[in-house]
Curated annotation (Swiss-Prot):
Entry coiled-coil feature ranges: none
Subcellular location: Secreted
Protein name: Interferon alpha-6
Cytoplasm keyword on record: no
SUPFAM superfamilies reported in the protein's UniProt record: 4-helical cytokines (SSF47266)
Family recorded in the similarity comment: Belongs to the alpha/beta interferon family.
Classification of source organism: Eukaryota, Metazoa, Chordata, Craniata, Vertebrata
Glycan attachment points: N101
Species whose genome carries this gene: Mus musculus (Mouse)
Annotated signal sequence range: 1-23
Function: Produced by macrophages, IFN-alpha have antiviral activities. Interferon stimulates the production of two enzymes: a protein kinase and an oligoadenylate synthetase.
Gene name linked to the record: Ifna6
Amino acid sequence: MARLCAFLMVLAVLSYWPTCSLGCDLPQTHNLRNKRALTLLVKMRRLSPLSCLKDRKDFGFPQEKVGAQQIQEAQAIPVLTELTQQILTLFTSKDSSAAWNATLLDSFCNDLHQLLNDLQGCLMQQVEIQALPLTQEDSLLAVRTYFHRITVFLREKKHSPCAWEVVRAEVWRALSSSAKLLARLNEDE
């Protein structure tokens, strides 16, 4: 009986190992939710990207600030939290609801909300660090500026279906980068 108990304890510890490497306890479901959100974004596509080529734009995703190779572990959670919050804000706007299938949009936003809750839980665990490093504030500003450019683009294009399609594809890339960052940080430990 004692061996079985010890074995189960080891299994429990090992099952949480990948999520503990970030210095916080992200639920194991976090990666699954992230993948599901990416899948939902693909399903939300209403137009062929080819029909919206004239509307394509480089929003300047801050890869150098958020990129998987440059960002440090201590910066990751606040930056990923900001990225997720900005995506959620964008897709819960009243203009967004007119652009997408309501069921897919609700599922996507629910997943984003859960991802955000996971990340905010990690932020609370890191609360003992009072001041943000300058590089972290710089990264947060870069994420906010990036989403400001997206918001301005949508406004300039009057929230047209093609504008939303361009933004959907851009958000997929941003969310995919965040998933890669988490995977890299988990591997580093």
